């Protein structure tokens, strides 16, 4: 199981929102779709990633008004990707090294096909997670 590819545990339904979307609109989309992140777009390109935690920590806690603050203004610009063939162990290692809770998952052509999060990994059997930890 330690060789499980991230494609087997990732979330496949990626939600894209334009950068001018407000925080309250993005939060409503996340709530309605039961997701914790959205990919921010600027025209046809990906401009960043915003998580539910970003909205709370980078915006609300800082006093930014959610009705007028855009997701582009708080988006993480550095989007860390792994290929869908990467193992869960490799994804865990990448998250640890980069201090992130989510990785974008791409195919061999670098097309986004999903997102793998700590929540996705938490759903794995304990034996798989322990196996990845022991190799660190």
Language-model region placement:
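Short beta->alpha transition motifs characteristic of CBS
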Residues: 35, 39, 46-61, 100, ...
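The conserved cystathionine-beta-synthase
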Residues: 16-34, 41, 82-99, 106-107, ...
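Helix-adjacent hinge/juxtasegments
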Residues: 46, 51, 64-73, 78-85
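Bateman (tandem CBS) regulatory domains
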Residues: 2-14, 68-79
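Short, charged, intrinsically disordered terminal tails
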Residues: 126-136
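Nucleotide phosphate-binding site architecture
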Residues: 7, 15, 24, 56-57, ...
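Short beta-to-alpha loop/turn elements within the nucleotide-binding domains of ABC transporters
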Residues: 4, 21, 50, 69, ...
């Amino acid at each position: 199981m330690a060789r499980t590819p991230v494609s087997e545990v990732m979330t496949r339904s990626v939600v894209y929102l334009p950068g001018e979307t407000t925080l309250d609109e993005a939060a409503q989309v996340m709530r309605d779709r039961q997701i914790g992140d959205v990919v921010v777009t600027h025209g046809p390109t990906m401009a960043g990633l915003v998580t539910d935690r970003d909205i709370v920590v980078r915006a609300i806690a800082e006093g930014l008004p959610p009705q007028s603050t855009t997701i582009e203004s708080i988006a993480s610009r550095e989007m860390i990707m792994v290929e869908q063939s990467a193992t869960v162990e490799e994804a865990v290692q990448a998250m640890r090294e980069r201090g992130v809770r989510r990785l974008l998952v791409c195919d061999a052509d670098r097309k986004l096909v999903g997102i793998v999060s700590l929540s996705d990994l938490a759903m794995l059997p304990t034996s798989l997670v322990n196996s990845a930890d022991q190799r660190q």
